[in-house]
């Protein structure tokens, strides 16, 4: 036995042994996909237009505050569409404001200038950058929420420019998961405008700097709205949930109800202390997603940076609220464009049918190869079993998730592996018909079939890579198993079966090849 053959046999034994080690025990090493173990699939679209509008709203509020601090005599700054309109009736104020914009707000460009009006906005490049950043922030925020929700092996990935795909295996409370993921959680602190009665505001007598928001009163049994209270709030946001450091569920022993205690960061605590110190006796509203949760009276300056959000919460609702506040608000609302739920019973049924399909397909192929190619068919069957071992080992090594399309990829891999052996065996038969000896026929058969097998597998591999790059979860699962299967089939068909032939020829010279 020469050194090359020994090296081949050692390599084959090492690869097979390593793959058996990787894939054992199989049920622990290979994770099942959503369609096999049950769970939820969501497709979300991020409203990137609103992300830009929110950015402009924040900039508008900042400019109003800046104008007040600089004592500039100008009109009411407001956003209209994707532009900020700044009325400037006096030439001096206009020049001063333009200098201020260049010095402090260089990210905004002057898009139009009239005698008594300045129009600013973001460039097209900046708008696209804001949109891209919004999707990235939404992706990270949703990941954080899911991590705190406690789902094992979730999939959260971006698709296209604004879509986010989420797969949550094993989730049972679907409604709660959807609420937790899709909630914007925009937390704002605003002062109540007590100079205007709610009746006047509802009748249309509302100052430009104010708006009406409602506090909802929910039925704790049915979780439906039974009443709501209007509040007139200043549009200016004192600060948002960006200043939030922590949010925890606490229990109020006096009323026997849970509430959410929030802790602000250093800058947030400073702002909170300043606002509460300057507005003792006034009401400060805590607004979440456009609804007033509470509007307590400020009794004294609060330097601790601690506040609480109370309401008619159940323990589960308070827990979910603390999760979304800790993970941060979404930079823009998200729309659920697809919501699919697979029950565990259906998933188990898919597993059973998938195993049955692989078993039947494998058995038919094994029988055909032995019946048609006799002893050589038996060698091909050994290579096919090695192929499956390598496939499972590499799936476990790469942490791939096995899906129903992935099982289809395994079945297709069986066909590809057999196809390579069929090409080799037919070439060997051609050489035998020409009168070549078994040894020479085997050498020539493998040599002449190699380029055909390589070309066919490379083209299939290219397609699999494209499917993986541009496909979603199930398609990616198919592409992964197909890619690994192609590589495994080339290894087993070209190297393993030939090494076995060579080993047989070393110990028993063959006059007639069983093929």
Curated annotation (Swiss-Prot):
Entry's Gene Ontology BP terms: intracellular protein transmembrane transport; protein targeting; protein transport by the Sec complex
Subcellular location: Cell inner membrane
Membrane topology label: Multi-pass membrane protein
InterPro entries for this protein: SecD, SecD/SecF_arch_bac, SecD_1st, SecD_SecF_C, SecD_SecF_C_bact, SecDF_P1_head
Family: Belongs to the SecD/SecF family. SecD subfamily.
Role summary: Part of the Sec protein translocase complex. Interacts with the SecYEG preprotein conducting channel. SecDF uses the proton motive force (PMF) to complete protein translocation after the ATP-dependent function of SecA.
Assembly and binders: Forms a complex with SecF. Part of the essential Sec protein translocation apparatus which comprises SecA, SecYEG and auxiliary proteins SecDF. Other proteins may also be involved.
Name of the protein described by the UniProt record: Protein translocase subunit SecD
Species per Swiss-Prot/TrEMBL record: Desulfurispirillum indicum (strain ATCC BAA-1389 / DSM 22839 / S5)
